[in-house]
C-alpha cells in the first residue's frame, strides 16, 4: 500500500533542536576509515588559511586536473556500514543506545529540506527499520543509473567541462586549507599547497544529534575544515567548522538566480548540522579564482528573502516548515515495532511524495545493518535487561 504526503504540507512550528556533535570519523587517502576521534581531529581535520594576498595571485583552480585522484562513483556513496561502526563505537563508550528516531546522512536530509524549491529533482531513498529506529539511505542502484544516463546524454565537451568544475571545488579546498594550524606549518608547506595532488578520497565526517519538532535525528555530514581552532575540554566544536564552496563569478542578472539556488542548498546542508560559516571561492570560465566571500549561515535566509527576484524568491522558513512536516510524517507513518524496509520517493513527473513497503528486502537489510551492529545491539539489550 502506497502512502502519499501532500507537497503543500507545512508544520506550524520550525523548532529545530540545536545540533550537538557526538563523534567524528574519517576516510583516508586509501579509502580506509578511522574511528579514533582524537586521532581523527589531529590528523584528518584541516584549517582554513587563504589570505587576500594569495587570492590576488589569481590561483588556477584547474591546475593539476590530469593528476586528480578521484574515488570511483560506486565507492563515493554514503557508506552506512562505516556510519554504523561509528555509532557502535560511541554506544560502546557510553554503554547506552543513541536516542534517535532517524539515523541517516546529512546530504539526504538536505534533499528533503530543499525539495520545495527543487521540484524537478527526483528522490529515491530506502528506509530500513531496525531496533526501533529508521535508518535512511540512498537507493544507490537508481542513483548510479541516473548518473550514468546523464553522462551518456551529455555532450562530451560539456561533460569534460563539468568534471573540471567539480575538480575546481576540490582544488579550492586544497589551496585554502592547511593540515595543521598556521603557526605549526612551515612556509614551504603553505606556499606549496598549489602543487599538492588533489583527491576526493579524504573526508572528515561529523556525526551530530539534532531534530525538528518531536523527531530526534542523528546526521552524519562531511566537514571541510576549521575556521580557527579545536576547542579544549570537550567544548562545542560545531561553531568552529567551515563549509567551502566554489561558484562562477556573477557577471549578469540571470546568474544571480542560479547562485541564490546554490546558496540555498549550501545554507540547508550547513544549517542541518550546525555549521555557522561558509566560504565561497568565485572562479571565472577559465577556472581562475577571482575573489572569496565569507557568509554567516544564519544571515543567508535574510539575504535570500531580500532578493529583488520576486518570482524566484526562496524563503528558508517555508522550506523548514515543509521539512518539519514531512519528517514528522515519515516518523509517524513507518511502524518502528517491525523490522521492515520501505521505499521513500519523490517523482517530479507526478509531483508525488510517497512511501511504500518493500516485500523482498533481505539483501537490502543485510547491506545496511551489519552483523557486527546487530550483535552489538543484541548484547546491549541483554545488559540492559
Swiss-Prot record:
Compartments reported by the entry: Nucleus
Family recorded in the similarity comment: Belongs to the DXO/Dom3Z family.
Protein name from the UniProt record: Decapping nuclease RAI1
Chain segments annotated as coiled-coil in the UniProt record: none
Major site of localization recorded for this protein: nucleus
Lineage: Eukaryota, Fungi, Dikarya, Ascomycota, Saccharomycotina
Species the sequence originates in: Debaryomyces hansenii (strain ATCC 36239 / CBS 767 / BCRC 21394 / JCM 1990 / NBRC 0083 / IGC 2968) (Yeast)
Reaction it catalyzes: a 5'-end NAD(+)-phospho-ribonucleoside in mRNA + H2O = a 5'-end phospho-ribonucleoside in mRNA + NAD(+) + H(+); a 5'-end (N(7)-methyl 5'-triphosphoguanosine)-ribonucleoside-ribonucleotide in mRNA + H2O = a (N(7)-methyl 5'-triphosphoguanosine)-nucleoside + a 5'-end phospho-ribonucleoside in mRNA + H(+); a 5'-end triphospho-ribonucleoside in mRNA + H2O = a 5'-end phospho-ribonucleoside in mRNA + diphosphate + H(+)
Protein's gene: RAI1
Any one GO molecular function term: phosphodiesterase decapping endonuclease activity
Listed Pfam families: RAI1
CC per GO annotation: Las1 complex; RNA polymerase II termination complex
GO biological process, one term: mRNA processing
InterPro entries reported for this sequence: RAI1 (IPR013961), RAI1-like_fam (IPR039039)
